[in-house]
């Protein structure tokens, strides 16, 4: 029994495409991708027969199903192309302008930084000079205070020496006065003894008297070593 088959072809195609250009570059690329699905189906053609009563398994159902069907499906993808494009004059000019603009902006940033650095340096210099001037004035004041302090020390030492000299001279004068009084007392005592003796002699006239002449001498010792005024003044220096 010959069978006839019906062939059906289904094709689905999807196309992706795009064009990309790099700014400032000397090349451009274009890419196109095509995907499609191809399906072939062969199914047996059914020729309905007149109704036949049959008890077997063969029949219309076997013709439809029993022989089965054949199908093939294939998915194909791919195809990409890259095209090199030369840089145009406008693109080169734009790239040159961008490079010049970049150089100008970079130089402006450097100038701004140098100006800011110069300003901060000047402010720091002024502050440092002001602080140095303040310190210098304080040092000058301190030096003046040191000079006055040393002057006061010298004057105080000189005043002390002067007062000590005056004190020594005062007590040396008192010592001299005391020694003078002692000497005068001794002389008075010696003179009285001589006068008694003379008066005894005058009582006899030319007659040898049997009287005795008594001479008295008084020495006073106070137990201290005596120094002259000159030696005392020299000892102060």
From Swiss-Prot:
Residues 111-125, 216-237 have a biased composition (Basic and acidic residues). Residues 204-215 have a biased composition (Low complexity). Disruption phenotype: Affects slightly survival under dry conditions but does not affect survival under frozen conditions. GO terms for biological process: response to desiccation. It comes from the Eukaryota. It is found in: Cytoplasm. Keywords: Coiled coil, Cytoplasm, Repeat, Stress response. Its main location: cytoplasm. Residues 115-193 form a coiled coil. Induction: Expression is highly induced during desiccation. Residues 161-179 are annotated as: CAHS motif 2. Residues 124-142 are annotated as: CAHS motif 1. GO terms for cellular component: cytoplasm. Residues 96-125, 204-237 are annotated as: Disordered. CAHS proteins contain 2 repeats of 19-mer peptides designated as CAHS-motifs that comprise each two octapeptides connected by a tripeptide. Belongs to the Cytosolic-abundant heat soluble protein (CAHS) family. CAHS proteins are cytosolic heat soluble proteins that seem to contribute to the anhydrobiosis in tardigrades, but their specific mechanisms are yet to be identified. It is possible that protection during anhydrobiosis might occur via the stabilization of vitrifying small molecules such as sugars, but not via the direct glass transition of CAHS proteins themselves. Trehalose, a disaccharide essential for several organisms to survive drying, is detected at low levels or not at all in some tardigrade species, indicating that tardigrades possess potentially novel mechanisms for surviving desiccation involving tardigrade-specific intrinsically disordered proteins (TDPs). This is Cytosolic-abundant heat soluble protein 86272. The lineage of its organism: Eukaryota, Metazoa, Ecdysozoa, Tardigrada, Eutardigrada. The gene is CAHS 86272.
